[in-house]
């Protein structure tokens, strides 16, 4: 490419929230690519505007068609924080892309309430399985949730009540960084009457009690905690087995003849970013897993 692709992070304060230098890059562009919401934030521009389709990977490949042009891609906040940046850099090297970030939603939210980013775990539910969050719900944990849509806060409140984490605190951030920014702080056990914006993020302060339900993050969980028909690796053997397997971040486990799934279930609790494939032919045992 003759010029680098400019990958520009834009906040909820839109074009006006960008520096003059970044504004001039956008105004000078010949091709501007982004979501409809981001494109609508721009003033009149001479560039051809292209909105993402449902097939992002194909759209990114097509960028090559404009390689002789000055290209800007608009993304939310920090494009490398659960954004389009990762996917773009799978197809183009960093020598072909200049990343110009704005503050991430996490940075803005932590700044509003004075929390240290390093003390917080991040979970994205955007286009992912909602149940992915369950493994993060632990006593004294702080979790930042990138919501899927306006229903996410209510679903999280329902889940926390079900898991008996009803004393936990929530911060619900809507339209963070924009004119319509709002921050709602509430206890999980308080009534929910709010209608939330699609653009929301949530910070959970997990507060447990003696009745709280959560996945232990240690090995040797009691056998009675697993549904089984007697085909189960006993607690003490399970603890030794898993320690010998030495699970690490991004490890892959194949469990052949899963039985109750106890080995795999415990393995998954040690690190959150692991992959497990279980092979089990007994239909009844599949239901246990």
What is the predicted function of each stretch?
Residues 285-287:
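Short alpha-helix immediately C-terminal to the canonical SAM-binding loop
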Residues 1-100, 107, 130, 276, ...:
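Class I S-adenosyl-L-methionine
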Residues 250-259:
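Conserved class I S-adenosyl-L-methionine
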Residues 2, 68, 140, 250, ...:
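Phosphate-coordination loops involved in phosphoryl transfer and adenosine-cofactor binding
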Residues 2-7, 20-23, 69-71, 142-230:
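A contiguous loop/helix-start segment that scaffolds small-molecule binding in enzyme catalytic cores
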Residues 260-272:
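Conserved SAM-binding loop of SAM-dependent methyltransferases across substrates and taxa
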Residues 232-249:
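Conserved alpha-helix/loop element of class I SAM-dependent methyltransferases that forms part
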Residues 105, 110-141, 148:
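Short, glycine-/small-residue-rich phosphate/pyrophosphate-handling segment
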């Amino acid at each position: 490419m003759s010029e680098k692709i400019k990958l520009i992070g834009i906040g909820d304060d839109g074009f006006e929230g960008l520096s003059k230098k970044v504004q001039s890059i956008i105004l000078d562009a010949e091709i501007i690519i982004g979501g409809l919401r981001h494109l609508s934030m721009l003033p009149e521009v001479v560039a051809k505007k292209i909105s993402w389709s449902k097939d992002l990977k194909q759209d990114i490949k097509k960028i090559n068609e404009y390689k002789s042009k000055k290209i800007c891609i608009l993304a939310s906040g920090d494009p490398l924080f659960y954004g389009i940046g990762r996917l773009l850099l799978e197809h183009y090297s960093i020598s072909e892309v200049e990343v110009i970030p704005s503050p991430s939603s996490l940075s803005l939210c932590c700044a509003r309430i004075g929390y240290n980013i390093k003390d917080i775990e991040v979970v994205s539910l955007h286009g992912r399985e909602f149940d992915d969050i369950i493994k993060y719900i632990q006593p004294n944990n702080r979790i930042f949730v990138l919501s899927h849509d306006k229903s996410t806060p209510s679903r999280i409140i329902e889940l926390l009540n079900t898991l008996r984490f009803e004393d936990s605190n929530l911060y619900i951030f809507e339209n963070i960084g924009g004119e319509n920014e709002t921050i709602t702080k509430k206890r999980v056990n308080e009534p929910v009457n709010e209608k939330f914006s699609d653009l929301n993020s949530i910070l959970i302060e997990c507060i447990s009690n003696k009745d709280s339900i959560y996945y232990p993050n240690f090995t040797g969980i009691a056998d009675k905690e697993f549904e089984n028909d007697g085909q189960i690796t006993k607690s003490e053997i399970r603890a030794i087995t898993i320690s010998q397997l030495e699970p690490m971040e991004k490890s892959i486990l194949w469990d052949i003849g899963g039985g109750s799934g106890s080995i795999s279930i415990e393995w998954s609790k040690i690190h959150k970013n692991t992959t497990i494939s279980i092979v089990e032919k007994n239909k009844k045992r599949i239901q246990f897993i």
